[in-house]
Amino acid sequence: MSTSEIISRVWGGVLYMQFHLDRALSNQECPSFYVAVHRNSYLHNSLPAILQFFKPFLKDARLAQSQKWWFEFEKVPLKWNFPVGLLYDLVTTDAQVEKQMWEITLKYYDYPIEYVIPIDQNPSFLKDHWTNQLKEACFILNGSSKLVMNMSRTDSDDFYHAAIHKDSTQFESMFRKLLPSSVSSLKNLPIKVYLPLSNKLIQPVLSNLGRKITLGNLLQDLIPDLFPSSLMYTVAHPYSHGVVLPLDSSIIDLYICMKSLDGFLHISIKMIQKNEH
């Protein structure tokens, strides 16, 4: 499969979701809202459509104008600043994945500020977050975020529009402008590795990217207890966009093909269950 085909599949991946309205927000029986949500997006991208559906059932219809809604899955608050697919890979088990429908509760009161970043009422809060992530990714790649900071307003708006509307061709065209001209000029790669159970996040520091570093090499160096072999899965699997990543893949190639809309390659680690051996 070519690089462009993989990128197209990454951007085309969806999750089938069922949203329930928190019972405290309505005085009547409320149907669920069903929708296919792109993995490579944010939950709040879908909020306008969700609220439009639930507005007739709200005790206080004025709440539909607010952005300070939050989402919960099996009593676990979901981080709005994570891509949808990453959230799903982090919080679901194999048994839940088999259901093929992700059930989420839409909530408003008792915002979990100890776990989820508070939402600014500024209408551009999501774009501001995305831009900050892109600046960080650019800094990791180049040692400077100037390429993002010096973008014209038009280019910045077009870039965000491409990300939010899943225009992978336009997104890739603009993202290539942030990449160094050669592999030897890469300072590092924007990668985040999420460990199971502990909610711990690791951002590896890579050096000498001129040589081929495989995902197996990276994970064996970072977390040898979970990846004692750089060639075989023995304890855990690395996931991104819902698929198990091959350990022999070049980490640079993986980044180019499977980075998310925020410019990072997100890798979630899941323990291998006994029945998988």
Swiss-Prot record:
Family to which the UniProt record says this protein belongs: Belongs to the ATG5 family.
Membrane topology: Peripheral membrane protein
Cell compartments where the protein resides: Preautophagosomal structure membrane
Gene name linked to the record: ATG5
Protein name: Autophagy protein 5
Keywords noted in UniProt: Autophagy, Isopeptide bond, Membrane, Protein transport, Transport, Ubl conjugation
KW Signal (keyword) present: no
Residues joined by cross-link Glycyl lysine isopeptide (Lys-Gly) (interchain with G-Cter in ATG12): 135
Description of post-translational modifications: Conjugated to ATG12; which is essential for autophagy.
Reported function: Involved in cytoplasm to vacuole transport (Cvt) and autophagic vesicle formation. Autophagy is essential for maintenance of amino acid levels and protein synthesis under nitrogen starvation. Required for selective autophagic degradation of the nucleus (nucleophagy). Also required for mitophagy, which eliminates defective or superfluous mitochondria in order to fulfill cellular energy requirements and prevent excess ROS production.
Subunit structure and binding partners: Conjugated with ATG12.
Organism: Pichia angusta (Yeast)
Principal subcellular localisation of the protein: membrane
GO cellular component: Atg12-Atg5-Atg16 complex; autophagosome; mitochondria-associated endoplasmic reticulum membrane contact site; phagophore; phagophore assembly site membrane
GO molecular function: Atg8-family ligase activity
Alphabetical GO biological process terms: autophagy of mitochondrion; cellular response to nitrogen starvation; piecemeal microautophagy of the nucleus; protein transport
Database matches in InterPro entries: Atg5, ATG5_HBR, Atg5_HR, ATG5_UblA, Atg5_UblA_dom_sf, ATG5_UblB
